[in-house]
Amino acid sequence: MADTWSIGAHTFTSRLLVGTGKYPDFTTMQRALVASGAEVVTVAVRRLELSKSGEASLLEWIPKGMKLLPNTAACFTAEEAIRTARLGRELEMGDLVKLEVIGDRRTLFPDVEGLVAAAKVLVKEGFTVLPYTNDDPVTAKKLEDAGCAAVMPLGAPIGSGLGIRNPYNLRIIMETVKVPVLVDAGVGTASDAAVAMELGAVAVLMNTAIAEARDPVLMAEAMRAGVEGGRKAYLAGRIPTKLHASASSPMTGLIGT
């Protein structure tokens, strides 16, 4: 039986979601997207060049069959984010939206007050909202109560590559909310993706870790394997941690005893 997961009316098999920014060129981006095995790709609505003559649109390079997840990147107020989400829908990018309301330009941490406010409006307008948020369980619960279809807490600041810095809060969020929890931002390498999945995340979203790797296509393959391995480890169940050793072989029936 396939190990699928769902957000709203959408069901997926791959638990890796990828972005489209920071690649050296469109060809590399396209090859990496294919190598990742991802079914969902996020695109910044405000950065789309849909009508620039003489130049191919970013959307033309996204492999056919991938689900578009428009995002409200670079929005610093709830009002900006709401307008941007509406623009994405006008461009026929669907009901899904990765909601970002940034509160600080240096850290790119979210403005959680504005985020919750924007989420409430967009949910009422029929959007399937996936909010990028901090790793605070209280905020995650407020977003769930606002009607968000999932919550996407950061593992570390966007593009930092620092990995999963606060696994304890992420676990509390997963225990607190009933909607899917996707780890978004901060992943640097495949082991970070595996850790996120081992904690119980439904999926992981990343961009910089693949796009700025020395070999983006190979890193996309590594991230795919990391997510799949972490998911299998979570389902299998790790052994309890212990302070002292526990012999693998029986201590009875030894030679000479």
Curated annotation (Swiss-Prot):
Binding residue positions for 1-deoxy-D-xylulose 5-phosphate: 159, 185-186, 207-208
EC number of this enzyme: 2.8.1.10
Entries under InterPro entries matching the protein: Aldolase_TIM, Thiazole_synthase_ThiG, ThiG
Active site (catalytic residues): 98 (schiff-base intermediate with dxp)
Principal location class: cytoplasm
Pfam family, one: ThiG
Single Gene Ontology MF annotation: thiazole synthase activity
Presence of the UniProt keyword Transferase in the record: yes
Pathway membership, UniProt: Cofactor biosynthesis; thiamine diphosphate biosynthesis
The protein, known as: Thiazole synthase
Organism, scientific name: Anaeromyxobacter sp. (strain Fw109-5)
